[in-house]
Design a protein with these regions (language model features):
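Aromatic/acidic, Gly/Pro-rich catalytic loop(s) in extracytoplasmic/lumenal soluble domains
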Residues: 100-173
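Generic structural signal of hydrophobic/aromatic residues within well-ordered alpha-helices
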Residues: 26-28, 90, 120-121, 161
């Protein structure tokens, strides 16, 4: 069966139900839900204009149905490390980019994997820049705050992050 724009076989299986068309959005939604992101998908998909910065496996972390930019797009290897060289610089970038959410894929950050980025996320939470933390199967979605958050709330959020986020395990790799 011919299944691609190049008229080659084998890329996508044809199903008569959809007359040969492939619903890539449904496929990505199923793949993301398999990784434990059902409610996170639903939240960010409420508005296709939502802007998300994703700390996750590239390019799969870009598949949410909104405006997603990976952390790698912003910093090394493809971006400008000056944008994230301090929490203040990253906050400035998020304000400039009108970022709504930050997403952290379960098992992506931790000792041996993007440690500096993990410390940056912790600092953003401690400073109150990320609020309304939501966890699903070790994945995290946090709202970027444009208002000052009380120190006690920020500390509670940081403790919740340490407890609920599923960190990268180098020994399991």
């Amino acid at each position: 069966a011919i299944s691609s724009w190049a008229w080659t076989a084998g890329f996508s299986e044809i199903h008569l139900l959809n007359k040969g068309r492939v619903n890539h959005r449904a496929q990505e939604q199923a793949r993301i839900e398999e990784k434990g992101n059902t409610l996170i998908w639903q939240e960010v998909s409420q508005d296709p204009e939502n802007r998300v910065i994703a700390f996750g496996t590239h390019p799969y972390c870009l598949q949410f149905p909104c405006n997603v930019e990976s952390y790698k797009d912003i910093t090394s290897p493809w971006g400008n490390v000056e944008l994230v060289n301090s929490p203040e610089a990253f906050e400035t970038y998020m304000a400039y980019a009108k970022t709504d959410y930050v997403y952290a894929e379960a098992g992506y950050l931790g000792p041996g994997s993007w440690e500096w980025s993990l410390d940056l996320l912790r600092e953003l939470i401690r400073r109150g820049s990320l609020t309304d933390l939501f966890f699903e199967n070790g994945n995290m979605l946090a709202r970027v705050s444009d208002t000052e958050v009380p120190e006690e709330e920020a500390q509670n959020n940081l403790e919740m992050f340490e407890r609920e986020y599923l960190f990268y395990d180098a020994e399991a790799q």
